């Protein structure tokens, strides 16, 4: 049975991964988060804590779903955003490489400029427009630099358990005859359940 550490297990994707693989005969999930009752506390911004935990667990893989995802709050909490979105992935990368684990890092389309008229592809030029995108890109760069065996997945408009754009639109459509939203954004809603598979 392959052991997989899932960081950020209380987020939309982390919960979807747990639903998908909790009863698997092939994988044993080790769920981590901060401030979540019933799961192992792991502060990915603390390199010593990460190294100790990963060396003890000796996982086959680490799936990093942990992130500071509140885009507006990132603009006000720049240091916290950088620690979680950039240094956290760096720490996980170093630890994964030390124990020979694969690292799957979840990133975002916010690493691109917001002016595309067609869907993005992985080779498009990155040009983040805010703190959230810049810190996620810094995290990607650390993963590339420090993780020997890694995958970076850029997702957008994730929806699943929890707050998200799709649920907000459905709720507003039920209670309002008219819903006003920005019309200058292009995105692809992504099912957390499908991504977890």
What are these regions (language model features)?
Residues 2-24:
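N-terminal Rossmann NAD(P)H-binding glycine-rich loop of SDR-like oxidoreductase domains
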Residues 7, 32, 62-66, 103-108, ...:
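SDR active-site strand-loop-helix element
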Residues 34-48:
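Rossmann-fold cofactor-recognition segment
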Residues 44-84:
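NAD(P)H-binding glycine-rich loop region in Rossmannoid oxidoreductase-like domains
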Residues 72-79, 114-118, 163:
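Conserved catalytic-core motifs of eukaryotic protein kinase domains, centered on the activation segment
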Residues 76-104:
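NAD(P)-cofactor binding segment of oxidoreductase domains
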Residues 83, 87-91, 111-153, 157-158:
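Catalytic helix-loop patch of NAD(P)-dependent Rossmann-fold dehydrogenases
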Residues 141-189, 193-194:
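NAD(P)-dependent short-chain dehydrogenase/reductase
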